[in-house]
A protein has these predicted regions:
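Conserved SDR Rossmann-fold cofactor-binding beta-strand/turn motif
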Residues: 25-35, 89, 102-104
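Hydrophobic alpha-helix immediately C-terminal to the catalytic Tyr-X-X-X-Lys motif of short-chain
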Residues: 7-15, 19, 29, 88
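The catalytic Tyr-X3-Lys active-site helix of short-chain dehydrogenase/reductase
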Residues: 1-7
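Non-catalytic, hydrophobic alpha-helical segments
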Residues: 81-84, 88
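A glycine/serine/threonine-rich, flexible loop-to-helix segment
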Residues: 21, 34-69, 80
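Short C-terminal tail/terminal secondary-structure segment
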Residues: 74, 86, 93-110
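Short, small/polar-rich loop/turn modules that mediate ligand/substrate recognition or access, typified
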Residues: 20, 25, 96-98
Length: 110
């Protein structure tokens, strides 16, 4: 997943350059898997297929991933990502653009 993420991050920075002088801010939100959002999205099938090949369930894999692969021992909640998105869209973050917000609970370090 590193290459697709890097492409999205680079694209967001290019958008910030192109749109900044029009007063448009661009902030890229990088999150890890969001367990409470998975059942609501197309990713449920992707996770189910992957974990079935590993001989486990999506829920068990997410729990293990959170404990072993994140610094905080958990994964981000949808509410946390939404709260941050609302903040960076607000005037309180009006000076911010061309930035990457790492909301991975420490699974990816910048």
């Amino acid at each position: 997943m590193a290459w697709p993420a890097a492409r999205v991050e680079t694209f967001s920075r290019l958008l910030a350059v192109e749109l900044g002088n029009h007063g448009i801010r661009v902030i890229c939100l990088r999150s890890d898997a969001i367990p409470d959002a998975i059942p609501l999205s197309y990713t449920q099938g992707m996770f189910d297929d992957m974990t079935r090949r590993f001989g486990t369930t999506t829920e068990a894999w997410l729990e293990q991933h959170a404990k072993q692969d994140t610094l905080l021992g958990r994964l981000p909640r949808l509410e946390q990502v939404a709260d941050y998105a609302a903040f960076v869209a607000s005037d309180r973050a009006g000076a911010m653009t061309g930035a990457l917000a790492n909301l991975t609970c420490g699974s990816v370090l910048d």
